[in-house]
């Protein structure tokens, strides 16, 4: 005999009632369970990346090797401390493990918060998680293939009268600063999404202040660009300007005033 189908609205209401019926200790127990699974996934991600740490390092050092080869220099990094290579591998495997584990960690976050959300709120969560990961990866890919190689080639070529002695720790820190920094910069639409959802900013306000925003973007690009040339600064600034324009569209879609107008128009059309 087939099991009866439960109406989604009833299921959501039952889930809300079950959540409200949970005691404080039960909430803590649920949180503890999700935290444990989060650490399990991070440890598993670290283990996988440690197993492949040499391949990951080869991928990470490719930009500097190309820059050194382009300037006819010895393609080898150095270290000044016996523990430096091992510590570098640990740091690299841990950060790469966080990337690998991030979808599973976000899923644990979803399992913890989902019972406390209404249906209209849940529809934002999964697109938010997907967009966050996608934008961060987009920033990292842009930095790895576009910004970082050009910056390294310029910097090493600019100081051709000196012999570089680049340590693996210094290179790793610079690599992570550029890649992670651009990944965070690419999260601009997510930040605007929440600000617009709370009514703090609007699409109209962002559009009216476009010229000032572009000026601020170029100032930020000048600060975070590792070189002093205008070309690399423009390479940094161009995607941020595009992300700002995309954020205007996001603000228009989610601002409470615009959502209320669309709902009223839909009700008037249906009526």
Curated annotation (Swiss-Prot):
Its main location: membrane. GO terms for cellular component: TAT protein transport complex. One of its GO terms (biological process) is protein transport by the Tat complex. The keyword Cell cycle does not apply. It comes from the Bacteria. One of its GO terms (molecular function) is proton motive force dependent protein transmembrane transporter activity. It is found in: Cell inner membrane. The keyword Cell membrane applies. InterPro entries: Sec-indep_translocase_CS, TatC. It is a multi-pass membrane protein. Keywords: Cell inner membrane, Cell membrane, Membrane, Protein transport, Translocation, Transmembrane, Transmembrane helix, Transport. Pfam families: TatC. The chain crosses the membrane at residues 35-55, 93-113, 124-144, 178-198, 213-233, 234-254. Forms a complex with TatA. Part of the twin-arginine translocation (Tat) system that transports large folded proteins containing a characteristic twin-arginine motif in their signal peptide across membranes. NCBIfam families: tatC. Belongs to the TatC family. This is Sec-independent protein translocase protein TatC. The gene is tatC.
